[in-house]
Amino acid sequence: MNFTQDLRLLLKSRYPIIVINTREEDRLEYIIKHSLNCSNSQQVYSWDFVDGYTNNPSDNGYAKRNPLLALEFIENLNNESLNLFLLKDFDSFLNEIVLIRKLRNLAKIIKTQSKHIIIISCKINIPFALNDIITVIDLPLPSLLEIKKEIIRLSKALNLNLNSELVNNITKSCQGLSIDRIRKVITKIIAQYNQIDSRSLPIIIEEKRQIINQTHLLEFYPYSKVNRDIGGLDVLKQWLQKRSRSFSKQSLNYGIPSPKGLLLVGIQGTGKSLTAKAIASDWMLPLLRLDMGKLFGGLVGESESKMREMINISEGLSPCILWIDEIDKAFSGLHSQGDSGTSARVFGTFITWLSEKKAPVFVVATANKIQSLPSEMLRKGRFDEIFFLDLPNRQERESIFKIHLSKVRPRSWQKYDIHELSLLCNKFSGAEIEQAIIESMHTAFSEEREFSTEDIKIAIKQFVPLAFTDKEQVESLQAWAGDGRARNASLT
């Protein structure tokens, strides 16, 4: 079911109090008044803290700055027809004991009447005492069809002649933005160019990047054709290649369900984060990076709201790649954390979404210490596959040297003895190989000459890799993967 159907069902089932999670107040009001087919006999009352009830014909502005009086108005209104009460700003007062008691009393009364309270909130933090009488649903970001209708409406209102291809491109670029933001960015484009054309697309993408980054939770990386070569990991590459068209219409028509995602487990510096970026580039999809540290930061109760916001943005932007870096740091020691169960609830919401999500969001989670993750995370159905990224073998080290040397010396990389270098750096990660090359370049540059194979050899000999400095952790991770708990990303 979509949002309108969900809301209509809740109203029909006489749910007394509904909290709708959204920042789009105007869009929600429009949906309620038009999509729900509210007739003249069905009254919609709207209240906010500053102006009170703004569409109350008998007393416009009633109950301003008084949320308790706003509830008493609902209680005392005598009307046999369906009445919907939209309460804005009300979520800021939900923890006040007088309002908690009033809402509980009111919920009993309006169950037998044609009254429904809808609280609009962008931060869900329901007091425990109200959990049994309040139902929370999310207003998703506009669908492609909704965005397209708005683009066509705006073009007609502004007397713009847009061809169908441009409309489709603008629509796709606006995916993940609210209707209000779409109107603002279109106005900005008109102010700059006096028209909408192909120059509009980068402006929309930049607007989207800024909006998503302002959440301080997600970072947005638009689709880029940048070549992101990864040395080795042939098994993982083959697995991804088979699924590169999984979000296409042809795949949907074939009956293939959208892939859920990957859990990449491995030693630091083996290419887990680079793999997430490479998937987005190869599959030609935008990339969202979730900062798990910021998910659990802030005030009590905010983590759950942030998780819902992350899900809403990801699904609104889909198809996309959601990259969750170092997920083990967020959920380690989950059952021992003394935060009144917040972490457990956020974790429960997350893994339920992983298992049940229908939107084409491909999750790429990375972990360095798999032992820290709750066992529920590793169950089948959470991710399509768990891959282990080990330290590269000799052939993979040769490939890594070739990639990095060709980046810094695209015309002369062949002069370096890659075979000899790959033999010298046994137990080096890809990141450590890159660092050895950079160190050799610093040495040669300081002496005002070109760096050589010998410089890289010296840098390798001076470098102490993680496999030695954190030997116990590396061997523990290799032993875990060796028991068949994860699929090896490389050919053995």
Curated annotation (Swiss-Prot):
It is found in: Plastid, Chloroplast. SMART domains: AAA. Its main location: plastid. Keywords: ATP-binding, Chloroplast, Nucleotide-binding, Plastid. ATP binds at residues 266-273. One of its GO terms (cellular component) is chloroplast. The keyword Transport does not apply. Transmembrane segments: none annotated. CDD domains: RecA-like_Ycf46-like. One of its GO terms (molecular function) is ATP binding. Belongs to the AAA ATPase family. Highly divergent. This is Uncharacterized AAA domain-containing protein ycf46.
